[in-house]
A protein has these predicted regions:
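Flexible glycine/acidic-rich beta-alpha junction loops that bind and position SAM and/or redox cofactors
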Residues: 93-94, 209, 240, 303-320, ...
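A general structural detector for well-ordered alpha-helical segments in enzyme core domains, enriched
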Residues: 23, 66-74, 184, 214-218, ...
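Canonical Radical SAM [4Fe-4S] cluster-binding loop centered on the CxxxCxxC motif
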Residues: 17-19, 23, 145-183
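Conserved C-terminal portion of the radical SAM core fold
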Residues: 55, 83, 198, 265-270, ...
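Conserved SAM/AdoMet-binding glycine-rich loop
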Residues: 6, 184-305
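Radical SAM enzyme core and accessory elements
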Residues: 3-6, 28, 32-37, 47-48, ...
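Glycine-rich beta-alpha loop elements in corrinoid/cobalamin-binding modules
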Residues: 8-12, 16-149, 561, 576, ...
Length: 653
């Protein structure tokens, strides 16, 4: 009896590691070994234990860093470094990466569908083993897979369409048209309890000449249309669903196959819409499904791609306009079919970013995209919370009413994207809270209006401006590369406030004057927000130096007018102003007097009248009046300090 550790890297994923579950079943129920499953690392109780064998699964290539960490961990807890095994998607697609970095690790590429793959006694075909759902209990306190109450299985293997961007032809090169799952489902029921849903991982089930047999078997297993399931924990009856998780090929969907799919508790029917060139084929497939009684459908919309071949076709690299039109087609189909069939038809769209199979860091940018657009789209998808785009009103609010508006949103500063929409009262919000939020909202609308006005006025300079923001990195250095003053002003909207403050350090007065003129005269709200940020924040004095030298008393007075004088603790910015004035060798105001004001206030040496007078003097940079008030109240301040010290001594005694 051996000690076996199954390890999944510490990434977030929706589905449990099916390969490890099969390996666990073999070791636990056929080899009678002790098996433990961990995600990332083992709990503290197992830290000192050494294992006879460790299996590490792999997923996507862009998860290489987490995978590498898991393999390093495996080698640290195994007795013999030659007894670490890996496999899965990354390990199959990039075996040289495993070999180069982990020469002692045994890499099982492809499927475990041959006798003796793991080199163990009694090993036949691990790929057909029952899944050991029991291993999920090992990490129940640490991680729960979003999809866990389901049978995970295959009824076919492979695909055969040979799409250039797809890994299936490498992972599953041979097409197997039919795999019965009845016995494996029965074993799961007997050993681990029945499951609510049936999640089929087939890559191209519609290609199978045994399609009718597959549908019949699924129905016989209790997943016919309208099927229900008694939840063992609650005793309540709930709907069951079938999910061909890897999608249905629109090119292979016929009226007969759609009717047969309509006999299942299918939700959703996943139909890929990878290229705008496939629009008519996609629309035909959606209509067939809807007219066959399937009410919930979804699609993956591949974007950020290159020129591809697949399914006997050639495809051009997609554009942002293409993505918008594909989403729009699905929204229009929802309305069309809902009206035609007189019941709700839902189509959820999931934009899916293309990443080359060899990309280890998820940083690929397609030929017709740029980093700015990709980041903006990611931000725009946040409200969907991974549930897809299905509402027509939400679609137009978030993605625009036209492809031109969509592309404009992609070019918009990321922070601005969150400012769009309508103002509405929030639940349990007081009138005062709403008024304060409305004030900020109104300011944000001014920002949006100013940015939009300038962006729409770009004309022939639009492509040039997009080239300046395309890398999604905004700097003073890039600002200097821009020649046109109007483009420079628009570019300022992409600056963070720290970057805007840094721009005041420019030695070129002409370049600096463009900034000063724009934020103080043309769009003073930008200056106002910069000042508030300085007054309310905790910025080091070095960040204020450029603005202090350039704007002098104007900057200092603006900051002092936004300081909160109602408390007893001096704001952080006061000390920064003292330091920056000393560094700049300038004499605008004796900011130490402000420290004196807060010290006097702390001990109660200032009445309301003198408080108002000194605050007014400070805000107007009236150093003489400030000094005079502090001098007048000095004796009272001294008496308060003595009384406070005496009180403290008595208390200590």
């Amino acid at each position: 009896m051996a000690d076996i550790l199954l390890l999944e890297p510490g990434y977030s994923n929706k589905y449990p590691p099916i390969g490890l579950m099969k390996i666990s079943y073999f070791h636990k129920y056929i080899h009678h070994d002790y098996v433990r499953f961990a995600k990332g690392e083992l709990p503290e109780a197992f830290r000192e234990k050494k294992w006879d064998r460790v299996y590490v699964t792999t997923l996507f290539t862009f998860e290489w860093e987490r995978t590498k960490k898991a393999l390093e961990y495996a080698l640290s807890v195994v007795k013999d470094p030659h007894q670490v095994y890996t496999g899965g998607i990354l390990a199959t697609l990039m075996p040289e990466l495993i070999a180069e970095n982990f020469p002692t690790v045994k890499n099982n590429t492809g499927l475990l569908n041959r006798k003796g793959t793991l080199g163990l006694e009694h090993e036949e075909c691990v790929d057909t083993m029952t899944l050991d759902y029991g291993i999920l209990d090992d990490i129940a306190d640490q991680y729960v897979y979003p999809a866990h109450d389901a049978y995970f299985t295959y009824m076919t293997r492979g695909c055969g369409m040979k799409c250039q961007f797809c890994a299936v032809q490498t992972l599953e090169p041979e097409y197997i048209p039919f795999i019965s799952i009845t016995e494996s489902i029965k074993r799961v029921d007997e050993q681990f309890g029945s499951k609510k849903d049936l999640l089929l991982m087939d890559n191209n089930v519609l290609r199978s000449p045994h399609f009718d047999e597959i549908i019949d078997e699924i129905k016989a297993l209790g997943f016919q249309k309208g099927a229900t399931y008694i939840n063992p924990k609650t005793g309540k009856s709930v709907q069951r669903f079938v999910d061909f998780n890897q999608g249905l090929d629109a090119f292979l969907l016929t009226p007969h196959k759609a009717e047969r799919l309509g006999e299942l508790a299918l939700r959703p029917a996943r139909i890929a819409f990878d290229h705008i060139e496939d629009a008519e084929t996609y629309k035909k497939a959606i209509r067939l499904c809807a007219r066959s009684g399937i009410t919930h459908m979804s699609n993956y919309l591949l974007y950020n791609g290159e020129d591809f071949t697949g399914k006997g076709h050639s495809y051009h690299a997609d554009t942002p306009d293409d993505l918008y039109e594909r989403m729009r087609i699905s929204m229009d189909l929802c309305e069309e079919l809902t009206a035609e069939l007189n019941h709700k038809v839902a189509i959820f769209s999931f934009p899916m970013r293309y990443i080359p199979l060899s990309d280890l860091k998820r940083g690929f940018v397609g030929a017709r995209w740029n980093a700015k657009y990709l980041r903006a789209l990611q931000r725009m998808l946040i409200p969907t919370q991974g549930k897809g785009v299905s509402s027509h009103s939400f679609f137009e609010a978030d993605f625009g009413k036209s492809s031109e508006e969509f592309v404009m949103y992609l070019a918009m500063p990321e922070e601005h994207l969150g400012w769009r929409g309508h103002f509405a009262k929030r639940k349990n919000e007081s009138d005062a809270e709403m008024a304060e939020r409305k004030k900020t909202w109104d300011e944000n609308q001014q920002y949006l209006g100013e940015w939009k006005r300038r962006f729409l006025a770009l004309g022939d300079d639009k492509d040039k401006f997009i080239s300046y923001i395309g890398n999604n990195s905004y700097s003073v250095e890039r600002y200097l590369e821009i020649k046109e003053s109007e483009l420079k002003k628009l570019y300022l909207h992409y600056f963070t406030i720290p970057t805007l403050l840094k721009s005041f350090l420019l030695e070129n007065e002409t370049e600096k004057n463009i900034i000063v003129e724009y934020i103080t005269q043309e769009f003073p709200l930008m200056y106002e927000r910069m000042i508030r940020y300085v007054a309310e924040g905790k910025l080091p004095y070095s960040m204020l130096e450029g603005a202090f030298r350039t704007l002098g008393a104007t900057f200092a007075q603006s900051v002092l007018q936004h300081i909160d004088y109602t408390g007893t603790e001096e704001p952080f910015v006061v000390n920064s102003l003292i330091k920056v004035q000393k560094k700049a060798r300038m004499s605008i105001f004796k900011f130490e007097y402000i420290q004196g004001y807060f010290l006097y206030k702390r001990v109660g040496a200032l009445d309301r009248k003198s408080t108002n007078a000194i605050v007014d003097a400070i805000k107007n940079l009236d150093e003489g009046k400030t000094r005079s008030i502090l001098a007048d109240k000095f004796e009272k301040f001294k008496a308060k300090m003595i009384a406070q010290a005496t009180e403290n001594e008595v208390g200590a005694a």
